[in-house]
Design a protein with these regions (language model features):
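Conserved catalytic motifs of ABC-family nucleotide-binding domains
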Residues: 155
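Catalytic Walker B motif of ABC-type/P-loop ATPase nucleotide-binding domains
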Residues: 159-162
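The feature captures the beta-strand-to-loop junction immediately N-terminal to the Walker
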Residues: 40-42
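Conserved ABC transporter NBD signature motif
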Residues: 63-71, 79
Length: 181
C-alpha cells in the first residue's frame, strides 16, 4: 500500500475579513510538496494577507488550512516548525550581530549543531566576513540576505516569500535562487 503524501499547503474556502472588507475571499488551493507557487496581483489584492494567514502570523476568519498535514487553527505552533518566512520585514534584531541573530533562531527551532548551521548559511549568503557586525550597519540588500539565512535556518518544508527580491542586487538574487532551489 502506498503512503499518502500530504500536500505542502491545502486551503478550503479560506477567508480573512477586516471590518467590512474581505482581504482574502474563499481561497481554495492545494500545493504539492516540492512545488513552487506564485501569487500575483495588484496592491491591496490580499497577497500579503494570505501569506500572513498561511504562515500563522494572522488567523483566518473562516475556512480551513493545513500545512504539511497540520491544521493551522488547531496547532499553529507545530505548523511553524515547517515554515520559513522571507518578508520585507526582516524579523532581525538590529543591535545584535549577524551570527547572534541566526543563533537565536537556530536555538529557537532546536537546530542540531547550531554553530555549524549558522556558519554554513552565513557563507551561503556571502556574509560570513560580516558575522560579528551588528545588523544595523548592514545595507538593505545585506539585511535581506541575512533574512534569507534566518528563514532557512531550520531547513523548513515550506518557505513563504513576500517580495523576496526587494533590496537585492542581481548577484544576491542569484544567491537567493540557488538557496531556494
Amino acid at each position: 500500500m502506498e503512503a499518502v503524501v500530504e500536500p505542502a499547503i491545502k486551503t478550503k474556502k479560506l477567508s480573512k475579513v477586516f471590518g467590512n472588507r474581505r482581504a482574502v475571499d474563499n481561497v481554495s488551493i492545494e500545493v504539492p510538496q516540492g512545488a513552487f507557487l506564485s501569487i500575483f496581483g495588484p496592491n491591496g489584492a490580499g497577497k500579503t494577507t494570505l501569506l500572513r494567514v498561511l504562515s500563522t502570523l494572522s488567523r483566518a476568519t473562516s475556512g480551513s488550512a493545513t500545512l504539511m498535514g497540520v491544521d493551522l487553527k488547531e496547532d499553529p505552533d507545530k505548523a511553524r516548525d515547517h515554515i520559513g518566512l522571507i518578508s520585507h520585514n526582516s524579523m532581525l534584531y538590529p543591535d545584535l550581530t549577524a551570527e547572534q541573530n541566526l543563533m537565536i533562531y537556530a536555538r529557537l527551532y532546536g537546530v542540531v549543531d547550531p554553530e555549524a548551521r549558522v556558519l554554513e548559511l552565513l557563507e551561503a549568503v556571502e556574509l560570513k566576513h560580516r558575522r560579528l557586525d551588528v545588523v544595523r550597519t548592514f545595507s538593505r540588500g545585506m539585511t535581506q540576505r541575512l533574512s534569507i539565512a534566518r528563514a532557512l535556518i531550520h531547513d523548513p518544508d515550506v518557505v513563504f516569500l513576500d517580495e523576496p527580491y526587494s533590496g537585492l542586487d542581481p548577484h544576491a538574487v542569484e544567491i537567493f535562487d540557488d538557496l531556494i532551489d
